[in-house]
Swiss-Prot record:
This is Aminomethyltransferase. Gene3D superfamilies: Aminomethyltransferase beta-barrel domains, Aminomethyltransferase fragment, Probable tRNA modification gtpase trme, domain 1. The keyword Transferase applies. HAMAP family: GcvT. GO terms for cellular component: cytosol; glycine cleavage complex. One of its GO terms (molecular function) is transaminase activity. It holds the Pfam family GCV_T_C. Its EC number is 2.1.2.10. The glycine cleavage system is composed of four proteins: P, T, L and H. The lineage of its organism: Bacteria, Pseudomonadati, Pseudomonadota, Gammaproteobacteria, Thiotrichales.
Amino acid sequence: MLKTPLYESHMAANAKMVDFSGWSMPINYGSQIQEHNNVREDCGIFDVSHMLAVDIQGSEAEKFLRYLLANDVAKLQENKAQYGCMLNHDAGIVDDLITYKVTDEHFRIVVNAGNRESDVAWFNQNAQNFDVAITPQTDLAIVAVQGPKAVAVIKRVVTKEIATEIEALLPFSFKFFSKWMVARTGYTGEDGFEVILPATQVKKFWDSLLENGAQPAGLGARDTLRLEAGMHLYGADMDTSTTPLERGLGWSVDLSDEHRDFIGKKAYFAKKAQGVDTKWVGVVLKTKGVLRAGQEIDFDNGEKGYITSGSFSPTLKVAIGLAYVPKQADNPVVNIRGKELEVELVKPKFVKNGKSLI
């Protein structure tokens, strides 16, 4: 099994390790709920070095990414980041990712752990007619520093000058400090940063964060945090069999430049014209119980919906989920252990900055 540069640190902290996309990763360090709450109230740190930073460089870097991605990187200013989907020719989602613009001729993309090899292969397959170099940065590590006290913690472990610049970063902005890249991005619904740095330096950084008030958090808390924030998990909430239209991600497909071609555009327009007969929603269980991926939601007209992600919400103290359901249907229920339990359909975002949105 693959190991991140922080593997020994996790073992020393008595983390419970699990296989995640072929990587040995910490699911928790004791109490998943405590780790979750700490990110909502204080500062938690995550090892996400199983994800991969890929640099796209060359005179046609922007032209290539305008073709490769459904969102339009031409909108990006330097030192800004953008969320978007990478589609196949049927408009199915190959991956969702964040693209960072360093210069007109240098972009960085961070891809999901389970798609590292397939994404890089897809980049290379589609780059043949463009003047670009594609470089997977396998010698880098990634640490997410998340929570309302993330700024305070990170300021304690860097120089005063760098602290001032980091604090000034706006959401979806980033800055390089030598070989370190600090971005005001995250996957928790809280303020925070994702720090991409040389793998040889990550243990010292991790230890400094812990010494200055941060607590480690595992993939279990990461999942409940992103679920509360209404953020998609690739492979659970969407994959190549789904288009952005069916998963509430149409906003991330930029159609403003009618002359721009991108992979999947023709199929996406056809799907858009045909219309989608489901909608993307949040689900809240009105009684005790647990919502899980794969559960059916039944409606009184006989139609069904399906939960793609579900869990107990430590912040809201109820079970929540993300689901696709028929556009017109009433009185939703889920069947749990032979009982029909009422659920409420809400907007697919439950918590932001520690506050309930439902």
